[in-house]
Amino acid sequence: MDKYLIANINMFSLNNQVFLVDDLTREPCQIGAYSLADLPQALVQIAYDNDINIIKIAGNNKYSEKISDEIAIQENLLFREKKIKVEVI
């Protein structure tokens, strides 16, 4: 099991929590909270900084797919490669 990020999308909140789940503890640890506008770039940067390949988006709502698409765009703009797998849970 690899470490991964979980982004908790709440369309009624100004800040959406981001958690890191690592191999050893399997317990989520909050590492930040971001607006919907800043979330895709923040997730990509955190993933690359921590060598994470999986981002899970919790909160299956209309913003989940938009955030998923924006993550792919930000990853391409920032790093010119595709290594992050995004799952909507």
Indicate residue ranges for each PLM-predicted region.
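Long, charge-rich, low-complexity alpha-helical segments
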Residues: A37-V88
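N-terminal basic/disordered segments at the start of proteins
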Residues: D2-L14
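A short, exposed loop/beta-hairpin motif centered on an aromatic-Gly-Thr core
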Residues: R26-A37
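Residue-level signature for short turns and capping positions that connect secondary-structure elements
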Residues: T25-R26, K62
